[in-house]
């Protein structure tokens, strides 16, 4: 993940949002394969033409998993775990995510993730630390407000503390013959990517029980 003029992490974002939008529900053990015409994470470009894959486990609200993507100079490998539950009409979650790299593309990110959802709206917050191996450690907070209905979603998100910048996504995800398809319009501001940027991204994926 590259953020605000700094090399930064996570990639559950784009493909994960599309899988949720298309109504994918996990079993106890599940796996996924995906491809994106461009890999952007949290509004920041990572790589053209990127393949990815992951394995997840969920039971009784607890979840854990790993996800990897091609970033050109090696792989990004994410690990995560947490717990989610419904309290009345509100869904709540708390978890941890670590972003690691096999090559020189980026350094390690680690963060605590908090989430809340009510009706069509969801709010996600991540409080993290960037272990910049060539410089001082940096702290960041990420926030995202998402509105989702019938496969369509809109998201406004951004960073604060040592990272800065904002972006906006409009997307649609659907499933055709058990294949997940998605399209995203992404608008990133100049604080996030050095110059304002607009992108159209296409994704395809397959999720299956193990």
For each of these PLM feature ranges, what is it?
Residues 2-17, 22-210:
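Outer-membrane beta-barrel proteins
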